[in-house]
Each structure stands twice: as structure tokens, then as C-alpha cells.
Amino acid sequence: MPILTCRYKILFLYNLRNCFTFQNQRCLIPYGTTTTIRWYNANFQAVQNNFSDYKNELISSHRPEASSLLDFLVKDQKKSGDISLHTKFNLYVDDLLKKSEKGQIKKFINDIKKDLATESQLPLSAPFKDESTRTMTDPQVLAYIHQSMPYQYASLYSVLTDLKIVNSDVSCKSQHILDCGKGPGIGALASYSVFPTPNSVSIVEENPFLKKIIYDIHHNIYPSTSPNPTSPVTLNRLPLGKKDSYTLVIASNKLLEMKSEKELFDYLRSLWSLVSNDGGLLVLCERGTKRGFSLIQRARTFLLQKSKNTSDKQFNAHIVAPCPHDGRCPIDIENGVRANICSFKQHFFLSPFSRLYVPRSHRRSSDRSHYSYVVIQKGITRPLNNTTQRFKNDEDLLENVNVTSPTLKNWPRIIRPPLKRDGHVIIDVCDSDARLRRNIVPKSQGKLAYRLARKSAWGDLFPLEGKVQSTSPSSKITKHLKDASSTYSINPPSYNKPKVERNTTADPIFVGKRFYSTNRHKAFSRFADFNSHRFPCIFTSFSCYNCISGTRKYSRQYSRDKFHYNQRTTIYYLVAISIFALGLTYAAVPLYRLFCSKTGYGGTLNTDQSRMNAERMVPRKDNKRIRVTFNGDVAGNLSWKLWPQQREIYVLPGETALGFYTAENTSDHDIVGVATYNIVPGQAAVYFSKVACFCFEEQKLDAHEKVDLPVFFFIDPEFADDPNMKDIDDILLSYTFFEARYDTNGNLLTKLN
């Protein structure tokens, strides 16, 4: 009992020491705890001396607080999200932007945004190339710095921090850094923040304006922010005469400038020749798009092939990060599947100059940099010890308290955001056997294991095996790259993959959109195998279908993307329907008039010229006569009179007839009128064919003038054969005159008053 009491006191005091801020051993805490603080100050030194003994006792008793492996996985490998450029850098760039012409800078910024949008939309087969800084004007350089410098710095800072974690020896060596990246020596700036002061720094840049910016930043600004400044050397081109001289070569956002594969491979050969044979490192970093990852994938394959094709051991190479293996990349980007790339994100705070030339509604204080990268070490092969070492439960995590650099290189890496569900965590990793694995870590696996899974993040090392695992289909040939001595094969196609048999253990988890469910698939497979002898046709076909497709279970991010896609699609359809309805509204009147004139619908006289022939103008004497009644009227205030000279005419179907109307101008001035007509009943209009009449023609009558207007017509013989017309004995032909009006161009305006 006294031992436990002392132990709890020590633990309480240690936690109290971590929770409060001290200034000359005075705690900034409320007044009510002064008694406790006096006792704490008196016993502080004794607690500090006894705490190391207590920690060793915890290690021996397997308590989780002392596990250095857990400390590494949960704390040490975590990257800070509080990344930002130094204030003096921000002030310098802000001053450059304010002195330049605002219109040109804004134009080039919009061009860069359009290029980024075009890159994400174009397929990989389409040609695309970034503009090199060699041909940029001064405003273009400033626009590129405004758009890319914070993102590029955050990406490189994250990559170099990860490199320092995985390969701890790199910080102990004498550093000779060569920065070949795009921009004002951003790789060198990031290396200053991660590694100790290097022995030498060289920056490759040809643009005169960028060289001036590099000089101002690295010679005037950086020395005032660092206790041990290093003056870099600016080079116009790669120093090919200094082969095997640099321990760290950084090339960021450069591969997209290459016009062809030959130029890309020549550039990679030149970079590789500059890397030191004694464990030198080559860092390649591009934007986290499909095209950027494709270039990183090509460079990775090419350099590994180059090292395998040489027998000299000093040219051996292996991947330091992010891949835990040197085999073929298991991610097949050619399928065009969403999220089918290996990329990572880094949170950072935007610089003040990044908010210039940005609408107020789009301004924000932080953002995320999306990038793909690879770090290759030259002259050293991958360590083979502990390649199969994995941890499954809390006891394994507590037994392994030592973390070494060779072990970290073979640990799986999380390649997608973990899916943290209620009671379990789903984690997708790239493993050391060149396969993609999905680990499901439930609460029942252990408190420490579940805590580790909940604390894991995208890009972390994750050596813990889940209680449930699914493996992507793979083959032995993916562990070794195919020899390509004559031609350089970049990510060769999958024709070497073996056929998947029915009883294979590979799960179709990584086929299709993104993820698939495994539990229901496995449960039904067992049920189908048990009952397949009873219903062979049903269960065999369903099992084959399930093995190929599986039951889809998308992540929350995919569900959100799908919702936004459906929302946008619905909006597009509504807009298209609205435009179509508006156009149909304007076209309805002339279309209806055309329809009526062709068919006679709605009482409109039939004007189809194909019916006006002599063969149809033959009377049907065996049919009854139809009485045609005439009517005349004028519209509005038109000072005319219109009346038919005959009230009615009896005609046979097919018999022609001639009728007359009389129009009189009763006013004291000349008037131009236009007549329209109608047929009643409307269904008979299709058979009422008009050969000649005065409708829709401008009729000018002088003051008090009177004229006769003829109407020559016949009823189509098909009228007698239509059963719907057998009860129709009377047809009314009505004409209406209205005054003609004209616009400023002399065109007739048909307006009824």
C-alpha cells in the first residue's frame, strides 16, 4: 500500500508539472490551489529525481505510458500543421508584388489557375507541359511565387520531415545540398528548417529575376533568421562535372516541364549521376494529381531499373519513402479510378501575400498542399532484417520498445485517410510485399491497438496488423521489376499477372471505384460453398459474380462526393429543361400556326399545295351536298364594312365553287387592311381546300372606295369517306379584316385592337 501511494503521488506530480507553465518555479494557476503548489515546489526536486526510476519500473511492468514504440507512432512521427513561411520572406514577397503592375499579375495568376484546372481534366494520354521558369517574364515569376511557393514549401517541409523520421542517419551526415526545383530555392529553404546547417548549398536557376530573388532571400533574409547561416551558390545549369558530390538532391515541380520521355529520362540520369554513392538521397516531388503521380511512378521505376541493370554495388538503390518496398507499384493508375493515386496532404498557414489578388469571399488563412513524392537512396541496399515483423495486440506493442531506422523503412504506410467508424477503424496501407492491404482494427483487438488506430493519420507508418485483413490481388512478378535493357519500360502492363482462380484468397477489395465490403462477401461465400451441391447453378453463378464485383461499401468522403455530383447533375438538368421550355414557348406560336395550316386543325384552312391538283377537283355526285355559309366582319375601330354577296352555297365533295365578298372604306382617308379566316366546325377545315382568296394580303382601299373580293374553293373528296364527317351538313367560312400597321423598317405588324 505505501508503494502504491508513493507511485500515485509521483504520477500526480509529474502530470501537474506538464499541465502548468512555470516562470522561476511559480505556477500561473488560480489562488485556491496555493497550498498544493507550495507542497509541490518543496517536493519538485525529489519528484524529478525519482521519476526516472518510476518510468523504468513502468517499462518492466509493461505499462503503456513507457512504451517508446507507442510514443513514436502516436507522437514522434506526427507532422506539425503549423507550417508557414518566415515573416521576413512574406514581407519581401509582399513588397515585390505591390511594386509590380497589378493587372499583369492578376492575369498570370488566372492563367496558372486555368492550367491547373486543365491538368486535372485532361487524360494522361493528352499532352501537357508546365512552363519553365527559364522563359518566364518578371510578372510571370511573381505570379508563380504567389500561387505555388506556400504550397511547394509545405510539401517539401513535410517530405523532408518524413525523410528525417525514416532515415535518421541523414541528419548526422555532412550535408551537401543541391536544389534543382522550380522556384526561388524552396527546397533549400525547407532543408534549413529540418536539418542542421549544411556544409554547402547549391541552387540551379537560369532566370535572372529569380536569381536576384534567390540572392535576396538566401543572402540577406535567411542569415538574419538563422544562427549559423549558409550562403548558397547559384548555378545556371546542373553541375554535371561534380558527379557523386551531393548527399541530398531535391527536384520539386520539375518533371512536368519535360516535353517527352526521352527528355525526362535524360534529366533523371543527370540528377542520379550527381547523387553521392555513399548513401546520397534523391528527392522528387510533384503535385498530387494523376499526372504528377504518373511522373513520380515513371521516375521511380526508371531509377530502380537503372540500379538493377548495373553490377556495381555502389550504384545500388532502394526506396526510402514513401514505399516500404522496391517492387513494382501496386497502384494501377491507368484504370482511371477515383483516388487511384499515391498522394499525401499537408496543412499549412497561407502567407499574407497569398491573399492578394483574391476575392474577399475566397480568402482564407490556411490550406492543404496535395503532393506525390519519392525518396531514393543510392549506394545502399534495403535492409532485410525485421521485414516481416508485425504487431497484432497490446502485448506486442509493449514488448518492442526500440525503434531503429532500418526497421522503419519496411513498415507499411497509410496511403489513404483512415475511416474511423464507431467501434472500429479501417486503414489502407501499402505493405513491404508490394501489396495493398486493408486493416480493420476493432476495439476488441486491444485498448492500445485501438488507440493507435484512432490516432493514425494519412501518410503515417502503421506496423499494426488488423484483426481483419484484406489483400489486393498481386503476383510474384510485382516484387521484381522486369529487365528492360533495350527499352525503358515504364510501369509495364498487367499481362504478366496470373489468372485468379475461383478459390484464391485474394479479395476484390481494391477493384472498382475504391473500396469493397469483405464481411458479407465472406459470410455468403461460406454459405454458398456449403449449399453449392444442392443448388449448383444458383450458387456457382452468384459466387462468381460476387468474387468479381463484391458488395460496394464506399467511404464517407466518396458518399459526400457522390452527393455533390448528384446535386450538380440535378441543377444542370433543371437549367437545361428551363432553357428548353423557354425556347419552346417562343417557338410555340409559329409551330402551331404551321401545324394548323398543314392539317386544318382548329378551324384553319388547309393550305397544303399537294392537295391542289385537278384529280381531286372531281365532284362526288353520289354524295349529299354540303351547305357553305359565308360571314364577314371587321376588327376594332377599322372604318370598313365587309359582307358576303351570297349567304350560302351548296357544293358536292370535289366540286369547285366561287364566292364573293364586298369591302367598303367608309372613312375619309385611305386605309390598308389585312384579312384572316376561320372554318367552323374545326374538324372540317382539313378538307376545305382554298385555291385562291384575298386573305393575308394587303388590301388598300381609298376613301369611300368599294371592291369585290373573290374566294375560289372546293371540299376535298376524302370528306365523303371520313366517318367523322357523316353528320356534318353545314360549314361556316368566316373572314375578318383588321387595319394593317407597319414598324419603322416597313414590316407589317399584325395587331388586333
From Swiss-Prot:
The keyword Signal does not apply. The keyword Mitochondrion applies. The chain crosses the membrane at residues 571-591. Keywords: Iron, Iron-sulfur, Membrane, Metal-binding, Mitochondrion, Mitochondrion inner membrane, Transit peptide, Transmembrane, Transmembrane helix. Residues 592-753 are mitochondrial intermembrane. GO terms for biological process: mitochondrial cytochrome c oxidase assembly; mitochondrial translation. Residues 1-39 form a transit peptide. GO terms for molecular function: copper ion binding; iron-sulfur cluster binding; methyltransferase activity. This is Rsm22-cox11 tandem protein 1, mitochondrial.
